[in-house]
Amino acid sequence: MGSEEEKVVVPRNFRLLEELERGEKGIGDGTVSYGMDDADDILMQSWTGTILGPHNTAYEGKIFQLKLFCGKDYPESPPTVRFQSRINMACVNPENGVVDPSHFPMLSNWRREFTMEDLLIQLKKEMMSSQNRKLAQPLEGNEEGRTDPKGLVVKCCVM
């Protein structure tokens, strides 16, 4: 018996179930939320996130929708994060909405302990950073459409 602490590695699906439970309960001050994109997704890969634009920034009063994809190596590897809502941020590709790990340290320095909640909170903090807080934002909603990798134009309509 050594004096070193043994770390218990929680299996991927148990970890995602914990995150789902936490997301369903509501987190923090209510300015970020997340949950499963498809309840029938038995691999628990596709998630949605929401960030309410922080006060006193160019994002104030806006609701930003995101897609998070947790591959088979999550939580060892970070999820892929894509803004569905149009947004102007230094770490987001303006063409496809993907958060660029090379410009968002949390993704490039991902650790197993990080969660989707942590990720959304950090993106909200990034919105408040000096380099992003005053950036001019695209028109409301997704009226211009965002072209996906297959060349399709993605549009959103709320009825």
From Swiss-Prot:
Which InterPro entries does this one have? UBQ-conjugat_E2_core (IPR000608), UBQ-conjugating_enzyme/RWD (IPR016135)
Per UniProt, residues of the UBC core domain are 11-159
CDD domains registered for this protein in UniProt: UEV_UBE2V (cd23807)
Q: Name one Pfam family in it.
A: UQ_con
Highest taxon of the lineage: Eukaryota
Q: Name one GO cellular component term.
A: mitochondrion
Q: Which GO terms describe its biological process?
A: positive regulation of protein polyubiquitination; postreplication repair
Which SUPFAM superfamilies does the UniProt entry name for this protein?
Answer: UBC-like
Q: Summarize the record's induction comment.
A: Not induced by stresses.
Which organs or tissues contain this protein?
Answer: Expressed in roots, shoots, leaves, stems and flowers, but not in pollen.
What is the stated purpose of this protein?
Has no ubiquitin ligase activity on its own. The heterodimer with UBC catalyzes the synthesis of non-canonical poly-ubiquitin chains that are linked through 'Lys-63'. This type of poly-ubiquitination does not lead to protein degradation by the proteasome. Mediates transcriptional activation of target genes. May play a role in the control of progress through the cell cycle and differentiation. May play a role in the error-free DNA repair pathway and contributes to the survival of cells after DNA damage.
Family stated for the protein in its record: Belongs to the ubiquitin-conjugating enzyme family.
Q: How does it assemble?
A: Heterodimer with UBC35 or UBC36.
* Name under which the protein is recorded: Ubiquitin-conjugating enzyme E2 variant 1B
